[in-house]
């Protein structure tokens, strides 16, 4: 086992230096159910390690789409891996087995489970945190990522029983992207169902892999991206998964943009649609996925020139750009955050925003307030957050 870890460590460090990523087969001795020894028969991952100077210790398994009949391995694989590297996250692009090559459910579930288990089992050699491994997938790969998030305890009969398979396959976060979700609804993608289920297709089996029906409170926090214009995999898929997360108390965030066809990938050239990945990065940051940090409850009062701020916000932005940002609404001069949502300990930039209506002296000559003059005000300070002092009395003089 030690030799194996050293081998993966060498591969990972070499991959970080070269333009071409290293390739690792998930079952070195042969995948269960394989029909041959070619790449199409033996699932593998490409390793895209984050540069050491940027690495956060987080990682993602990336599942390209293609209707379970092909793999959009560039714009839904390589490009995504490079984007993750840019925010300090190591990426592992999964080449799973396809229905067009004679592989059907549960083979694909086994492949994504094995990828997550492999990354977690080799976390030390890869320089990542075994408790910060996410899964992202696009289109049919989005369905695969949603199966990883909901069926992580499923153990297909043909599953191997080596040391890697004893490791948890549950991802710590999931990001199904314009995903196929339902295999039974009118909005389902018929081609994905055909390729996934193959000759064993039945309504009962299709229901088993309709992941909106498989969400439980143990499903990991989930981020979803979708476009309303998508006519190939309609938005009802992503929405149904989001609503299932809400029903089960799973933290979830859905971004549904109006324009945009199916299969856009990152689409960074679009000034609007291309912002979705930035929202994903912010979400990961505030989940504590990029940088786990101790947080503290805090409450207090905010006043301007002696008068309580009637309506505003207070934001705690930590010095570490990867640590979570905390924000609270100020109402009637008061705010409160619990230990789960409060600021991280340490040096923090504090920003308070408020209505200029809270600042005396902005009245018109006849004594009435002018809405044109009531522009928002703000102030920013640096302070040290200490759990021993959970209250803050902030007095702003203007």
Model-flagged regions — what are they?
Residues 48, 225, 235, 239-293:
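C-terminal catalytic histidine-bearing segment of alpha/beta-hydrolase fold enzymes
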Residues 218, 223-226, 230:
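Short beta-strand/loop motif that positions the catalytic acidic residue
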Residues 291-398:
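Glycine/proline-rich low-complexity segments that form flexible loops, beta-turns, and polyproline
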Residues 20-58, 185-188, 216, 289-292:
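N-terminal cap/lid segment of alpha/beta-hydrolase-fold proteins
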Residues 182-183, 229-233:
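Acidic catalytic loop of the alpha/beta-hydrolase fold
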Residues 72-74, 78-80, 93-130, 268-274:
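Catalytic nucleophile-loop/oxyanion-hole region of alpha/beta-hydrolase
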Residues 56-66:
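Short beta-strand element of the alpha/beta-hydrolase
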Residues 114-192, 206-211:
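Primarily recognizes the serine-hydrolase "nucleophile elbow" in alpha/beta-hydrolase
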């Amino acid at each position: 086992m030690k030799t194996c870890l050293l081998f993966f460590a060498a591969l990972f460090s070499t991959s970080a230096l070269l333009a071409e990523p290293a390739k690792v087969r998930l079952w070195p001795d042969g995948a269960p159910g394989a029909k041959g020894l070619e790449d199409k028969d033996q699932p593998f991952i490409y390793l895209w390690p984050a540069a050491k100077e940027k690495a956060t210790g987080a990682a993602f398994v990336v599942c390209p789409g293609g209707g379970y009949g092909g793999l959009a391995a560039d714009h839904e694989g390589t490009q995504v891996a490079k984007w993750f590297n840019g925010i300090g996250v190591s990426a592992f692009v999964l080449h799973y087995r396809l229905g067009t090559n004679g592989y059907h459910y549960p083979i694909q579930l086994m492949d994504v489970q094995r990828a997550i288990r492999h990354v977690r089992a080799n976390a030390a050699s890869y320089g990542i945190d075994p408790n910060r491994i996410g899964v992202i997938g696009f289109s049919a790969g989005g369905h695969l990522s949603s199966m990883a998030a909901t069926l992580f305890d499923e153990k297909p009969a043909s599953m191997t029983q080596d040391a890697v398979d004893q490791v948890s396959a549950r991802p710590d976060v999931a990001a199904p992207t314009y995903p196929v979700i339902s295999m039974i609804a009118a909005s389902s993608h018929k081609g994905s169902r055909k390729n996934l289920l193959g000759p064993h297709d039945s309504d009962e089996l299709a229901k088993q892999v309709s992941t909106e029906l498989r969400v439980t409170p143990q499903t990991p926090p989930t981020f979803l991206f979708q476009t309303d214009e998508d006519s190939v995999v309609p938005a009802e898929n992503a929405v149904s998964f989001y609503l299932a997360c809400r029903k089960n108390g799973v933290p979830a965030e859905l971004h549904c943009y109006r324009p945009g066809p199916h299969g856009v990938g990152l689409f960074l050239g679009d000034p609007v649609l291309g912002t979705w990945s930035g929202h994903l990065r912010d979400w990961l940051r505030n989940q504590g996925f990029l940088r786990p940090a101790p947080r503290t409850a805090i409450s207090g009062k905010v006043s301007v020139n002696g008068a309580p701020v009637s309506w505003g916000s207070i934001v705690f932005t930590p010095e570490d750009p990867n640590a979570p940002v905390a924000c609270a609404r100020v109402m009637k001069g008061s705010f409160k955050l619990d230990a789960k949502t409060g600021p991280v300990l340490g040096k923090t930039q504090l920003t308070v925003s408020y209505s200029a209506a809270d600042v005396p002296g902005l009245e018109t000559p006849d004594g009435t307030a002018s809405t044109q003059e009531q522009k928002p005000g703000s102030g920013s300070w640096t302070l040290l957050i200490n759990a021993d002092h959970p209250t803050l009395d902030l007095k702003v003089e203007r």
